[in-house]
Amino acid sequence: MIFVDTNVLMYAVGRSHPLKARARAFFEQALNEGWRLCTSAEVLQELLHAYLPVGRVTTFEDAVRLIERLDIEVWPLEAGDALAAASLATQHPALGARDLCHLASCRR
C-alpha cells in the first residue's frame, strides 16, 4: 500500500507546476497497475486548509473526485495517532506535527 501525501494530490489537480505531469503519471500508473493507495483525513484537511482561504474549493473537490475515482482508502486520524506522533517526534526530529501524524497513521 502506498500513502499519498497532500502535495502529490495538489500537483495532480492544481495549477501549472513542474511536478504536475509527474503526479498525474503516478496516478495513471497506479490505476493501470492496480496499486493500492491510501491517504488520511488529515490530508483532506490539509487540502481544504490550502484551497478554502483562496477561494479554490473546486480544486479541493477535484482532489476528492480523484481520491474517489482511484478508490484511494482514506484513513481516519485517531487520537492514538496524535499520541503516537508525539512519541515519534524524538526519533524523527526533522518531521513536523502533520507529517508525524501521517507516519503514525501509516504505522497503525
Protein language model annotation of sequence segments:
Residues 33-34, 69-70, 91:
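Structured helix-beta-strand junction loops
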Residues 31, 68, 107:
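Anion (oxyanion) recognition and catalysis
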Residues 72-108:
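Active-site neighborhoods of divalent-metal-dependent phosphate/nucleic-acid chemistry enzymes
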Residues 1-39, 52-65:
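Short, well-structured N-terminal submotif of metal-dependent ribonuclease cores
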Residues 9, 44, 82:
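Short, solvent-exposed loop/turn segments at secondary-structure junctions
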Residues 50, 66, 103:
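Short acidic/histidine-centered micro-motifs embedded in hydrophobic/aromatic stretches
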Residues 41-42, 79:
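Short secondary-structure boundary segments
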